[in-house]
Amino acid sequence: MKLYFKQRFFSWFDSYDIYYEGGSVAYTVEGKLSWGHCLHILDPYGEHIATVKQQVLTFLPKFDLYVGERCIGTIRREFTFFHPSFTMDFCGWTVEGSFMEWDYTIQDGPRTVATISKELFNWTDTYPIDVA
């Protein structure tokens, strides 16, 4: 499955849509101003699916993922010298790559779960998400 988002993927205070390959809206992401970053993920009908909240006052960035009121896990940045690496403790996935260039993969051990990369030669920055 392939999804797309345009330009401001991680704009913490805006809302933006993520599209299916055919152009219909798959998800809407709304950023809220709060103590730490907060993103709300909605389905195409406006129903709340999940929330991502930043933990404040931590040495490396950490984000809690909530479904409803229940925290299902944490996404944490690992200490590395050469490239950013994140771990999702609720499923054991890792995220590695060049975040500044929007080119990275999500791995479940040796299996690639998804890849995100910037498409070149578009009028606006378009980022495809290939979901395995």
Feature map (PLM): residue ranges:
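Intrinsically disordered, low-complexity proline/glycine-rich segments
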Residues: M1-A132
